[in-house]
């Protein structure tokens, strides 16, 4: 009898274990089919709206949002590719998608939605090879807090070069391109519009007026909205969404701006490729495009018909002559020197902000005195100081050399982060060059002041 009971108990245990295993497999399969994992650099104000609306339209589906900076998202997808659990990569910077495409980390997808033109401005909305899709357009420009500007007597800027003026000293904020894909596009836009040498000179003259280089891209609109600083160099939706939220903010596109699509792509070997495609279709649908006009989002739709529902004064890249004449952005050039440009910005600006700002302040003060008391020798010293700040440790030809650009593989999040090998050697030489020039520029400007 005891043997029979024991036998039945073992049989029952085996059946229970088998049932649990089958249940686990079933639940796992259900989770794979009904969970969509998205790596994105976009802020919660945007992702929350799309998550809620997509889940509402697809009951039982869960969107898992993994928030990462663009460069960190690229790194994550590369490092997890052998056991990929990500379905979609969703970010602004098209050159980031080119990096993933070149590493065979994106899957092709054919969009079914109609009504999306081939181009916005001069730039293709979708990747011509089919690996990623544009869902919104983006331009780059300047936002400012009107209340702050009135209190500090700051004029309204109309061009990048306006931010070089002494009146803006310590009133400007920007993120670093190594920390933000959209900021990288802004820097590249200026470099491509003005040329390598003149573009960096513009960038450094503006940076000399920075109050802050923020750790994250959204730190710039936060700083402007809160009045921590008055002016921010941003992607357009930061300025437009701040307006939508009721902040006293204005935004303009300078004449030298680029108009490029913000994108989404299916990751190669996505666990839920079918649902990933459905999310792309949702973004490009009438409903998805209208969501871009939400006051907390305020991005430029890629479907021209959506602008009929846009608020008054909302930019329209399909009929705004200023935006249609935007710079033809060279994506291949940007991608080829992506890490190099980021490293150069950090060495010359991010990590030497105090040195650059001190030299800039000395020049501003000397020029103010020179305006009152003209002096040829003092003017010569001031011009020499300006030239020293503008000097670059690398030529455009070197920057565009693919072998040299390939040296830059590691991104430094902060000055204390260590790089090794050839990249470390090059950055150390750059740093020595930059510090010497900034210090000498400050010294010459102070000498000029002594003559006035």
Which residues does each predicted region cover?
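Ligand-binding "clamshell"
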Residues: 100-108, 127-129, 241-253
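A bilobed periplasmic-binding-protein/Venus flytrap-type ligand-binding module shared by bacterial periplasmic
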Residues: 143-148, 259-273, 291-292
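C-terminal non-catalytic accessory extensions
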Residues: 364-452
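A ligand-binding cleft/hinge motif common to bilobed small-molecule-binding domains
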Residues: 95-99, 225, 230-248
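A structural signal for short loop-to-beta-strand junctions that line the ligand-binding cleft
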Residues: 84-89, 107-146, 161, 170-174
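Early extracytoplasmic/lumenal segment of secretory-pathway proteins
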Residues: 32-98, 221
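Mature extracytoplasmic/periplasmic domains
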Residues: 267, 272-275, 280-333
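Periplasmic-binding protein-like
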Residues: 202-207, 245-270
């Amino acid at each position: 009898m005891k043997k029979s009971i024991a036998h039945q108990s073992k049989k029952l245990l085996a059946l229970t274990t088998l049932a649990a295993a089958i249940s686990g497999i079933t639940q796992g399969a259900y989770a794979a089919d009904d969970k969509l994992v998205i790596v994105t650099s976009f802020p919660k104000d945007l992702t929350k709206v799309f998550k809620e609306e997509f889940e509402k339209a697809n009951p039982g589906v869960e969107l898992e949002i993994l928030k990462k900076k663009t460069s960190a998202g690229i790194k994550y997808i590369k490092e997890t590719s052998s056991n990929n659990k990500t379905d979609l990569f969703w970010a602004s910077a098209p050159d980031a998608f080119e990096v993933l495409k070149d590493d065979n980390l994106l899957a092709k997808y054919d969009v079914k939605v109609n009504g999306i033109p081939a181009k916005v401005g001069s730039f293709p909305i979708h990747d011509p090879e089919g690996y990623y899709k544009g869902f919104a357009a983006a331009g780059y420009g300047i936002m400012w807090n009107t209340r702050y500007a009135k209190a500090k007597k700051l004029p309204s800027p109309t061009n990048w070069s306006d931010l070089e003026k002494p009146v803006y000293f310590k009133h400007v904020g920007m993120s670093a391109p190594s920390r933000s894909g959209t900021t990288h596009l802004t820097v590249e836009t200026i470099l491509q519009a003005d040329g390598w040498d003149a573009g960096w000179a513009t960038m450094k003259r503006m940076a000399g007026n920075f109050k802050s280089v923020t750790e994250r891209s959204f730190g710039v609109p936060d700083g402007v909205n809160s009045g921590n600083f008055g002016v921010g160099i941003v992607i357009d939706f930061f300025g437009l969404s701040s307006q939508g939220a009721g902040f006293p903010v204005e935004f303009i596109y300078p004449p030298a701006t680029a108009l490029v699509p913000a994108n989404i792509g299916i990751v190669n070997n996505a666990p839920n490729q079918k649902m990933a495609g459905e999310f792309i279709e949702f973004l490009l649908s009438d409903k998805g495009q209208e969501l871009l006009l939400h006051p907390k989002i305020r991005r430029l739709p890629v479907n021209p018909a959506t602008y009929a529902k846009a608020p008054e004064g909302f930019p329209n890249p399909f009929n705004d002559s200023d935006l249609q004449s935007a710079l033809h952005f060279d994506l291949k050039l940007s991608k080829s020197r992506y890490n190099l440009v980021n490293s150069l910005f950090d060495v010359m600006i991010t990590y030497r902000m105090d040195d650059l700002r001190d030299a800039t302040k000395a020049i501003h003060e000397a020029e103010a005195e020179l305006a009152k008391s003209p002096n040829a020798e003092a003017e010569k010293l001031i011009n020499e100081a300006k030239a020293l700040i503008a000097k670059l440790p690398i030529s455009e030809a070197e920057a565009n050399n693919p072998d040299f650009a390939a040296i830059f593989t590691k991104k430094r999040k902060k000055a204390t982060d260590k790089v090794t090998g050839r990249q470390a050697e090059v950055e150390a030489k750059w740093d020595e060059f930059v510090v010497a020039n900034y210090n000498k520029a400050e010294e010459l400007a102070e000498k000029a002041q002594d003559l006035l």
